[in-house]
Curated annotation (Swiss-Prot):
Molecular function in Gene Ontology: ATP binding; ATP hydrolysis activity
Quaternary structure, from the entry: The complex is composed of two ATP-binding proteins (SsuB), two transmembrane proteins (SsuC) and a solute-binding protein (SsuA).
Binding site for ATP: G45, R46, S47, G48, C49, G50, K51, S52
Reactions accelerated catalytically: ATP + H2O + aliphatic sulfonate-[sulfonate-binding protein]Side 1 = ADP + phosphate + aliphatic sulfonateSide 2 + [sulfonate-binding protein]Side 1
Entry-linked Pfam families: ABC_tran
Described purpose of this protein according to its UniProt entry: Part of the ABC transporter complex SsuABC involved in aliphatic sulfonates import. Responsible for energy coupling to the transport system.
Gene name of the encoded protein: ssuB
Residue ranges, annotated region (Disordered): 250-271
The species this protein was found in: Yersinia pestis
Descriptive protein name: Aliphatic sulfonates import ATP-binding protein SsuB
Enzyme class: translocase
Primary localisation category: membrane
Length: 271
């Protein structure tokens, strides 16, 4: 397997008082966060807490309602060409062969580098096949190659392994970790799998009701051995916080739920 040519150091990120609202609903509330260049950060939390919204803001797919996103002293939007986002679905075009999916949107002489990145993810021999011939894990490898060919400094991962079987998921985790160590880009991984977050990240963020409720450093050597006592203890710490949030957070959650139910009842009465 060949090595992809050097990718520049990762993008540093600063969030200053970031908020995001959809109508009257606040999804992200006054986020303050600094991520150093090349750091691997995992973001966990309950469904609807704002994890994926955060990634969309960082990718430039949506604008924040409040605050500023920075990369160093410049706006993060200036680094948009160096940012790539991977989704849970590989989103390959079925009418284009694997190599053409990797080079999608590129001009000039890109095919040699496309073959190189496919080799990096272990799929050089599938370059001229159709996506329909690939397994779910192989499709995600193609999606990863499609991101790598752009030489990203910031890689955003929105549950990219969530639909894979357990063994394929472990293999993909190892591949992502090796590529990150080799090339030094900054990674933000959104995942519902706390064990995955602990195994891969330098740092785990827990988002609760649109705010950062926990910021936990994972100061363990790599490669990390699954099932180790230290990993299990960290996983238990995060899970306990996810399942048993502080009283203020839970009261806020119940208040929002009651408010929504009250609004729905009022609408039914009015009708």
């Amino acid at each position: 397997m060949t090595t992809l040519t050097h990718i520049p150091q990762g993008t540093p990120i600063t969030l200053e008082s970031i908020g995001k609202r959809y109508g009257n609903r606040t999804v992200l509330d006054n986020l303050q966060l600094r991520i150093t260049a090349g750091q691997f950060v995992a973001v966990v939390g309950r469904s609807g807490c704002g994890k994926s919204t955060l990634l969309r803001l960082l990718a430039g797919l949506e604008a924040a309602s409040d605050g500023t996103l920075l990369s160093g002293n410049a706006l993060l939007s200036h680094a948009k060409d160096e940012t790539r986002l991977m989704f849970q679905e590989a989103r390959l075009l079925p009418w284009k062969k694997v190599i053409d999916n990797v080079g999608l949107g590129l001009r000039g002489h890109w095919r040699d580098e496309a073959l190189q990145v496919l080799d990096t993810v272990g799929l050089a021999d599938r370059a001229n096949e159709w996506p329909a011939a690939l397994s779910g894990g192989q499709k995600q490898r193609v999606a990863l190659a499609r991101a790598l060919i752009h030489r990203p400094r910031l890689l955003l991962l929105d549950e990219p392994l969530g639909a894979l079987d357990a063994l394929t998921r472990i293999e993909m985790q190892g591949l992502i970790e090796r590529l990150w160590q080799q090339h030094g880009f900054t990674v933000l991984l959104v995942t519902h799998d706390v064990s995955e977050a602990i195994a891969l990240a330098d740092r785990v963020l827990l988002i609760e009701e649109g705010r950062i409720g926990l910021d936990l450093a994972i100061d363990l050597p790599r490669p990390r051995r699954k099932g180790s006592a230290k990993l299990a203890a960290l996983e238990a710490e995060v899970l306990e916080r996810v399942l048993s949030p502080p009283q203020g957070i839970e009261a806020s959650r119940q208040g929002i739920k009651a408010s929504r139910q009250g609004t729905a009842t009022s609408r039914r009465v009015a009708n």
